[in-house]
Amino acid sequence: MSLKQHTQTIFRQQFDRESDITIKAPGRVNLIGEHTDYNDGFVLPCAINYETVISCGKRGDRQIRVIAADYENQQDIFSLDAPIVPHPEYRWADYVRGVVKHLQMRNADFGGADLVICGNVPQGAGLSSSASLEVAVGQALQSLYQLPLSGVELALNGQEAENQFVGCNCGIMDQLISALGKKDHALLIDCRTLETRAVPMPENMAVVIINSNIQRGLVDSEYNTRRQQCEAAARFFGVKALRDVEPSLFFSIQDELDPVVAKRARHVISENARTLAAADALAAGNLKLMGQLMQESHISMRDDFEITVPPIDRLVEIVKSVIGDQGGVRMTGGGFGGCIVALMPLELVEQVRTTVAQEYPAHSGGKKETFYVCQASQGAGLC
């Protein structure tokens, strides 16, 4: 049974009527452009065919009633006419409540709704299950009530809900690619202006995500430290963000910076240049160059930003040994564990899967990987 059929069936069972519409919003993976988003830089993600699906219907009153199909049909009910506060027990409900509250703060005019939510975006793998949920809830209410909100506004609304209501710091990339993703394309995003450019993916190309299943320890504290180091480097150069520092200027005076801060800045400045070059390489179908840029990105994360761990480095090497210059591979996400992303011809996927299964556990303390084969998918909309 598809997610759409599943949510529609539960809607019928729980609410004794048919849903009005069913919508979806995808998760994402970032192909290149790591830790550049909060430096006003560039990222190159694509939406993936793992998604949050919501079947929904209007109500005649001002109640929002939500069923979480993935949590044994737990239910949350709250009123649009009372202050919306965090749920005392259900963490998932805060993402829904936060999106609704921030839509109200945008003066969106909508009434009550019944929602049944289901998803298959892996949680805790860095594939943006939370952004997918936020965009899906916003899209559901927009579609039910014809709200005059653009995809960018729905993405910003989700980001605000996560930052201010749920209390998790995040950039705009995850929500933006979920809202605006385009089938068979990656999306080059300027994180300062929020301008986007769709970049076609080569045909017969798989996006493979491999979860190392190494728990991401230290990620919050180290993330904050990296962010502070980047801000210190920007202050040194007298600019708003490292996005504004030309590589030639940086390399001419990097010796005047604190050595650790210089390494962090070198990653961000070079990663921005790599991301722009990668968008052009991908559009031209130049997989050899794309692979080189992804390899340089990983080395920079390992040596300059220092956010990889040995099992992740080994996982990247194992995949690279199979795909050679026919694609690219690197760690993706915040670091200290999590996932790697690889672009490769479809015909190499099974060889990569087999080789990783044979070789990786010896380098991970016996942990086995989780393997996802994805396609670049369409952003949020009707299901």
Curated annotation (Swiss-Prot):
Query: Catalytic residues?
Result: 174
Positions with a binding annotation for substrate: 34-37, 223
Q: Name the Enzyme Commission number(s) assigned to this protein.
A: 2.7.1.6
Which annotated residues bind ATP?
124-130
Can you quote a single GO CC term? cytosol
Q: Which residues form the signal peptide?
A: none
| Reaction(s) the record says it catalyses | alpha-D-galactose + ATP = alpha-D-galactose 1-phosphate + ADP + H(+)
Q: Which Pfam families would you find in this protein's record?
A: GalKase_gal_bdg, GHMP_kinases_C, GHMP_kinases_N
Q: Which UniProt keywords apply?
A: ATP-binding, Carbohydrate metabolism, Cytoplasm, Galactose metabolism, Kinase, Magnesium, Metal-binding, Nucleotide-binding, Transferase
For this UniProt entry, the molecular function terms from Gene Ontology, in alphabetical order, are: ATP binding; galactokinase activity; magnesium ion binding
Question: Which GO biological-process labels does this protein carry?
Answer: galactose metabolic process
Q: Where is this site: Transition state stabilizer?
A: 28
Q: Please tell me where Mg(2+) binds in this chain.
A: 130, 162
What subcellular compartments does it reside in?
Cytoplasm
Where it mainly occurs, coarsely classed, is cytoplasm
Pathway membership of this protein? Carbohydrate metabolism; galactose metabolism
> What is this protein for, i.e. what is its function?
Catalyzes the transfer of the gamma-phosphate of ATP to D-galactose to form alpha-D-galactose-1-phosphate (Gal-1-P).
Q: Which family does it belong to?
A: Belongs to the GHMP kinase family. GalK subfamily.
Record-linked PANTHER family? GALACTOKINASE-RELATED, MEVALONATE KINASE/GALACTOKINASE
Q: What is this protein called?
A: Galactokinase
